């Protein structure tokens, strides 16, 4: 028995490993793996079902078919273990060796491995520096290649056709060596001296200047170096020995009726063996060359098909006309090994069923049908039955359970007690899609779910199904209880707000309960407390809504957390007093003394969690739910057709609109407006009418007239059921009520354009056939959109998870002083997101100074919680520099301080938290709520009229930034700078509003001026761009020659004449080189200088500019010299919704991006070409100027002589994130991507914390391009992981050597995922073949740092609870201790023994 245990122990040993390396296999290595050569294509004998000897399933090579039994049956049983039978040559051992023993095929002629040949860029081609076409022609026996030129004039690697070869033979005889086929390529590869080649290339690299050549050389150098360093030999890319997969991994299963089901691989192998054997025979017979050649070509094709079918030529098909599944197909794609079996496994101990409501459950419970529980917990029940002595054997226990004896149910109750189960609803879009509950046994067959967790699961009860999983081990149960229990997941990880929020009925119930009503029964009573309130309500003495005075005792907690109680008599209603009874101690009464809608309830729960913590909140949430359901039932709110009150004003409003439309139609027919203008105006009219009807309807619905106690009629908020449902946030919205009782309004055609006749009817009146038909467009598009959206959103999430999966919090503090400056998000006159929301839960990067003093308000490295944020608000701080993931200095992972608060828990984040995955889920999960559509700015959808002035909303003082201006004769300011910003500051120094002021705008008040709310502070003409003079003097025309560079135009209506500058295309020959300009001179005729510079004031005029001045006229500073008409930008489509988010994260360059200034300096224009202008920027310090050619049709925002800063916009358009990174740096690009992504989510009302987007941006910025390698071994122009560059630089700095310099690169998420250090992670994401080919050639090591790699190799992940295990392993490795070998316990040994003994009876195939 002892040696048996020893033997078992040897089999359960797990291999401990630190990394996985992939490399090319040498022929000797393949032979060393092999247990014998497969010589015959036969598989199994169809009569005896025994494998054929030397065939693809041969027992002698691969091992016995039955456990511990040789093929001929001479040796059976365990005692002959390890004997090799003399008759059939089979080793007596377990049959599972047939899963691991490999064979091999000795190929009669070498064949190229198709991956290294055809996977682009072709590795063989790159190594030999030959085009792929040529190599293919050699491999498939169409031409010869010269291997050794000898004394002849033939070059090595030269391609010869058949004729050329024969000519050369005649001419030179055997002076030279030329071959065809894989042997030739193999010989070429063998003869390469990699190191020498490398040296030559490096010298070439230093000498060349051409960019393309450099690129090609660096590619080759990298490949050669990879070969040298990894120890791979180039000739191994040509196979001489082909490994054969173990037979149990390519099974052949007999079906009934004498047919066989087989893996496609067997067919592919059979082909290879057949052709190989035929080739061997032909070579033995010394057959004619042409036949042998053909056979070799066919062998090459057969091997290609086995490795990667369909990569070259047509795929080989099986009997059913489908392409056969080759080895490459086995591992790639959704159905491949990686995604189907390694990353997504099916789980035992699980069941699924329909869900239904469990309104009486507690938050941590779920109802589990008895039938299901019995099945799921079977093994536990068997164990308990045996332990109690109620059953003697497992078999007896099994019988008892099958008979469902009474005692079984009692045992089940015990087993289930406090054993959590996991509930999962597909699709699991974020981590709250799986939560743990304690099961409560119920009758019936449906799982009961607590209503408050529906929001997290996105579940409803219209037939949704959920799956139940049982955590088996103690550790799993512990994790389920401590981390996954629904009571521990009250806050959403995406934004830190409660996700356990009542909805629908509960909200309606609470709203109904806390509403007040004029002159209700019992109004004016004074009550001793909530208890009495409930008593008089139950007794029917007072209505729930009666306004009464109640004595209320509140417990107030001060900052130290001590509580003091205070009692006061408060004006409230009976319902609110009753509700107060369930509110936990420590919250103020004001929190319930208001009509509670959904937002208010959410805020109440949030406050409760922040003040009192987890447990009271959970109890409170449950109580809220029970109360809400009870009072919703009491309210009896129901919807009848009469509740949809149609406003009387509707008919009048529609009539007015129709008259206006008719009027515009007349104008159109008389030619006053164009068709486009007419269409737009009509749509605007109807949109306005719709708004008016809706307003009339809501005004009508939301109030009702009642008689109060004094008999006077007064208005109160309505108790109309539909209004209450919308107002409380329980169901429906104003927009939906508008369709019920207002008018349906404008509809869109399937292409997105708006139909100009609206649906004037509503659902209460009913639609006529035409109206119904129009509305079906929208409905159908909605359904089609939803289907597309779900798929796209899922794919976005997958890409995000893949790029961020290896980001884990690995240390407490990286010590950096960098960070990003946070300011409130202000658009125009309203604060979209206050500073408080943006910095809450962040850590300060430097001290926050109290505004106006030198006092430190908040020290450095402080986690800003609610209290600190209150302090910031009190002192009206409007910008804070906080730590950010993007600027974190940790090498692999991020530090806790740079991340800040764990949003789902409310304290600083723990080490080992997988922040990358959380970020990806938080961004991906709301993806399905985003729209798919691209908005047409047209129709009523969203058309902003061209802005022409700034009107402030609040009073305060103005603050102008990056401003240059001149004061004109009227004493007003004329802006002469490009990106001027105007901010409105209130008396506390906070920014309230922010606007962009264009060039040439006229401002009545300057910097620091006080303004009142509603005042207009700036005006400009949106349709022209002025040229403003900065000095006073007299005008002098330069190069303004009539007929050559300008023409005169006279306006027919006013009779005024003006000069128009001709575009260079319209000028005659002599005028082409002239540059029309206006100079400003003084009375003597000398040039006036621009203030602060030594440049003469002259303004060059671009084409189409209009001048309304004459030569010699006197002008004052700030006057307009010329006007340049702006073509109104056509209706551009703004991409919205999901596609926009995907574009941002993929870092795609927009079609016509904004052109930014590459360096700071003075603008001038050089010589123009036919379609382009030459923009020259000369730096102020006199260094080299920068030139760029810009197409003529791009409108430029700059004039000659203007000073620009690096990164300023030269020509408008959407900015490319790559340009922003290059010119303005990492923080600017972070800000840009964050703001743009948030814009999309904000439109849909989804809140996501900026942190998550920053996490993804950090991953997009992982790589950099080396500019100068210094003393490192990087190549210049190489893309390298930033962490590796930083580590290398630190090492060099310590040694005092030259560090490498680099620029940061921004990669899209797909590219970034494929460019990760880990080849396992990249291969399991996309383009498996390419990734593995690259990794094998380079001999890459995967250090298994990320989560995905560890899941694939079947280890604990280095995050969460697995973090400690990995830290422990690292520590042991550092100290050089031996890894702990898991000891086999007695139970495991007996289980294994039972398995061995049973193996003889039933041979189970998996």
UniProtKB/Swiss-Prot annotation:
Amino-acid positions noted as binding Zn(2+) 1 in the UniProt annotation, renumbered to this chain: 70, 72, 85, 88
Top EC class for this record: transferase
Cofactor note: Binds 1 Mg(2+) ion per subunit. Binds 2 Zn(2+) ions per subunit.
Sites where the protein binds Zn(2+) 2: 814, 888, 895, 898
GO MF entry, a single one: zinc ion binding
Positions bound to Mg(2+): 460, 462, 464
Transmembrane segments: none
Required co-factors: Mg(2+); Zn(2+)
Gene Ontology BP annotations: DNA-templated transcription
Pfam families assigned to the protein according to its UniProt record, in alphabetical order: RNA_pol_Rpb1_1, RNA_pol_Rpb1_2, RNA_pol_Rpb1_3, RNA_pol_Rpb1_4, RNA_pol_Rpb1_5
Keyword annotations of the record: DNA-directed RNA polymerase, Magnesium, Metal-binding, Nucleotidyltransferase, Transcription, Transferase, Zinc
Top-level taxon in the UniProt lineage: Bacteria
InterPro entries from the UniProt entry: DNA-dir_RpoC_beta_prime (IPR045867), DNA-dir_RpoC_beta_prime_bact (IPR012754), RNA_pol_asu (IPR000722), RNA_pol_N (IPR006592), RNA_pol_Rpb1_1 (IPR007080), RNA_pol_Rpb1_3 (IPR007066), RNA_pol_Rpb1_3_sf (IPR042102), RNA_pol_Rpb1_4 (IPR007083)
Record's keyword annotation contains Translocase: no
Catalytic activity, reaction form: RNA(n) + a ribonucleoside 5'-triphosphate = RNA(n+1) + diphosphate
GO cellular component: DNA-directed RNA polymerase complex
Role summary: DNA-dependent RNA polymerase catalyzes the transcription of DNA into RNA using the four ribonucleoside triphosphates as substrates.
Complex formation: The RNAP catalytic core consists of 2 alpha, 1 beta, 1 beta' and 1 omega subunit. When a sigma factor is associated with the core the holoenzyme is formed, which can initiate transcription.
Family label: Belongs to the RNA polymerase beta' chain family.
PANTHER family: DNA-DIRECTED RNA POLYMERASE, DNA-DIRECTED RNA POLYMERASE SUBUNIT BETA
Stated name of the protein: DNA-directed RNA polymerase subunit beta'
